[in-house]
């Protein structure tokens, strides 16, 4: 469009010059040379404009790729805590047990004893198990005779009906209670420890100076791997919170130093 405008404009100038200069025309070569220069200038202008647009487009693409890469890194950090389960056969579950802590058990039978290396004094189980561990109980009673007491009283038990939990991202997920693996489905059990009561003694935790401190027994949680699903899909191993201990929480009384 601009080239056509240049040609028309030059033709107009040539007509004016022919009238004003006693009908003398410009040399044909100089006119052609001027037209060629104008055309080249217009082509160069369009080329530079296109190059600028290409640079802007490439810059926008680079910025978008960087932003997408950052988002992917964030998603991968979250997904790194999630191990999907493709098949629910027994062999795969046996391989995936490395994701479990001792507090998580996959079994076709209800567990009757605490996990290995866990104390039995606070285990809430059957009388048969308690009779089997009478020697350990006598040892615990012997400790109490020496004046050793727990600040808080706790109890531990296998939770057999856990249906939901909070994962490491703060999302609520569904805990798989029963997993079908061929002819023998297995269930998922959680060994949890919690406080028996908030105040084992009148003023709070046992053995705390109540003149200067407020105290209360509180159940503490930690993360374990468990088979879960989110929104009825994405079945896999996730970190979830369960009750694992009982601690004494202290706060200084106002006006006390």
From Swiss-Prot:
One GO molecular-function entry: growth factor activity
PROSITE patterns (alphabetical): NGF_1, NGF_2
Alphabetical list of InterPro entries matching this protein: Cystine-knot_cytokine, Nerve_growth_factor-like, Nerve_growth_factor-rel, Nerve_growth_factor_CS, Neurotrophin-3, NTF3_N
Cysteine disulfide links: 152-217, 195-246, 205-248
A Pfam family per the record: NGF
Propeptide, residue positions: 19-138
Glycosylation (residues): 131
Main location class: secreted
Keywords: Cleavage on pair of basic residues, Disulfide bond, Glycoprotein, Growth factor, Secreted, Signal
Function: Seems to promote the survival of visceral and proprioceptive sensory neurons.
Database matches in PANTHER family: NERVE GROWTH FACTOR NGF -RELATED (PTHR11589), NEUROTROPHIN-3 (PTHR11589:SF4)
The protein's name in its UniProt record: Neurotrophin-3
Organism: Gallus gallus
Native organism taxonomy: Eukaryota, Metazoa, Chordata, Craniata, Vertebrata
